Amino acid sequence: MSIGILGKKLGMSQLFDDKGNSVPVTLIEAGPCRVTQLKTTALDGYTAVQIGYGLSKEKHLSKPEKGHLLKSGEELLKHLKEYRVEETSSYEIGKQITVKNFEVGQKVDISGKSMGRGFAGYQKRHGFSRGPMSHGSKNHRAPGSTGAGTTPGRIYPGKRMAGRYGGKQITTKGLLVLKIDDQKNLLVVKGSVPGKPGSIINIKPNNVVGKKGGEKS
């Protein structure tokens, strides 16, 4: 399995296809990343490739972190991510990982932290229907029943209620790569990806087996 790449979400735009239809796209600054460690079954119990992305200041790193990063290059990196692989023979410490690892028409899975919306109610967070808005109603945006009475005498875990909305790690699968600019390290994918502009995201090849992900028929 091929490894992925770390990048930064730049924002959204649009492209026009051959028929003149507007296609929403997301612009991603993907890499360049550096291989910082190769993990083997003998030493670590599993096989993986660790990469780093984004520059960091020395004062923000501990001595062990600094020593670990300097083994693969002179620049100190801020974000680390590892990918499980069957073998590491095709990788070496210090090797650059760029958008050239991807190709137009390929499908990718993108993970990131969704935009936080703070404390939200039932309608906004879960899409509940509101109550009557007419005169005399006291149930405009109330949740309704949250469970039974004496038995079970509690609210079951997982009950959809008001609370913090967003700000979680999520993955959007099967996004189509429409354009690649290796000079500017740009990756253009169809649709939206998690996070706000400037947030760090993880892009890896789509590995759904036996399913047609991303595109709707």
Swiss-Prot record:
<dbReference type="InterPro" id="IPR019927">
    <property type="entry name" value="Ribosomal_uL3_bac/org-type"/>
</dbReference>
<dbReference type="InterPro" id="IPR009000">
    <property type="entry name" value="Transl_B-barrel_sf"/>
</dbReference>
<keyword id="KW-0694">RNA-binding</keyword>
<comment type="similarity">
    <text>Belongs to the universal ribosomal protein uL3 family.</text>
</comment>
<keyword id="KW-0699">rRNA-binding</keyword>
<dbReference type="GO" id="GO:0019843">
    <property type="term" value="F:rRNA binding"/>
</dbReference>
<dbReference type="Pfam" id="PF00297">
    <property type="entry name" value="Ribosomal_L3"/>
</dbReference>
<keyword id="KW-0687">Ribonucleoprotein</keyword>
<dbReference type="InterPro" id="IPR000597">
    <property type="entry name" value="Ribosomal_uL3"/>
</dbReference>
<comment type="subunit">
    <text>Part of the 50S ribosomal subunit. Forms a cluster with proteins L14 and L19.</text>
</comment>
<dbReference type="GO" id="GO:0022625">
    <property type="term" value="C:cytosolic large ribosomal subunit"/>
</dbReference>
<comment type="function">
    <text>One of the primary rRNA binding proteins, it binds directly near the 3'-end of the 23S rRNA, where it nucleates assembly of the 50S subunit.</text>
</comment>
<feature type="compositionally biased region" description="Low complexity">
    <location>
        <begin position="142"/>
        <end position="153"/>
    </location>
</feature>
<feature type="region of interest" description="Disordered">
    <location>
        <begin position="127"/>
        <end position="162"/>
    </location>
</feature>
<protein>
    <recommendedName>
        <fullName>Large ribosomal subunit protein uL3</fullName>
    </recommendedName>
</protein>
<keyword id="KW-0689">Ribosomal protein</keyword>
<dbReference type="InterPro" id="IPR019926">
    <property type="entry name" value="Ribosomal_uL3_CS"/>
</dbReference>
<dbReference type="GO" id="GO:0006412">
    <property type="term" value="P:translation"/>
</dbReference>
<dbReference type="GO" id="GO:0003735">
    <property type="term" value="F:structural constituent of ribosome"/>
</dbReference>
